[in-house]
């Protein structure tokens, strides 16, 4: 029993959930934070604006923790920190990310009663979920992204260590170099695309 309690305490001291939330809000959402600093300093944000920002932070912060959601059940019922699967389905997979899409869509529709905004909130929630997988990929060396099509862990970041000789050709070397960066690019682009629907107008302004 003492060993189980110590194991649980060690698990709770691990900062991973905090890191996942902060990474999404302050790294992926850095442009959005920059966009509101001006209106915030000029006190131009209304209560409605503040409520919208809090809703986005809530959806993003919660959905980035969805891959580890089973840890709550296992701590209470099984007294373990197991959190990587629901039955045979790995939670760190694109298949399980459908839970974030569904949650984001339902919250978006409940808040705005508009299908378009519900879709954009779902995309925003999905981008939050995917940042969790990318961080775990870096830390643990892979996730089961393609389950059930491919059940073994895949690491998009380990591909960066592929040398020219290992790649076998210039094309394969360039492709391996681009993959991990492209995955991060797509996740950031999804978040920015979704935020554009909620008042964050990211446009290029020509110099006068």
List the predicted regions and their residue ranges.
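N-terminal membrane-targeting hydrophobic helices
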Residues: 1-208
């Amino acid at each position: 029993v003492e060993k189980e309690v110590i194991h649980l305490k060690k698990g709770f001291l691990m900062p991973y959930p905090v890191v996942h939330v902060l990474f999404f809000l302050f790294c992926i959402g850095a442009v959005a934070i920059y966009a509101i600093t001006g209106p915030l300093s000029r006190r131009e944000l209304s209560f409605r604006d503040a409520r919208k920002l809090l809703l986005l932070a809530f959806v993003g912060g919660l959905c980035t923790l969805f891959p580890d959601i089973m840890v709550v059940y296992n701590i209470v019922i099984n007294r373990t920190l197991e959190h990587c699967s629901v039955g045979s389905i790995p939670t760190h997979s694109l298949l399980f990310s459908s839970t974030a899409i569904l949650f984001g869509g339902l919250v978006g529709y409940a808040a705005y009663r508009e299908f378009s905004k519900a879709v954009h909130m779902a995309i925003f929630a999905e981008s939050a979920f995917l940042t969790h997988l990318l961080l775990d990929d870096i830390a643990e060396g892979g996730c089961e992204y393609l389950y059930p099509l491919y059940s073994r862990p895949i690491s998009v970041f380990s591909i960066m260590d592929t040398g020219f000789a290992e790649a076998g050709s210039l094309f394969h070397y360039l492709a391996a170099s681009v993959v991990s960066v492209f995955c991060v690019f797509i996740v950031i682009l999804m978040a920015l695309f979704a935020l554009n629907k909620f008042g964050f107008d990211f446009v290029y302004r020509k110099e006068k």
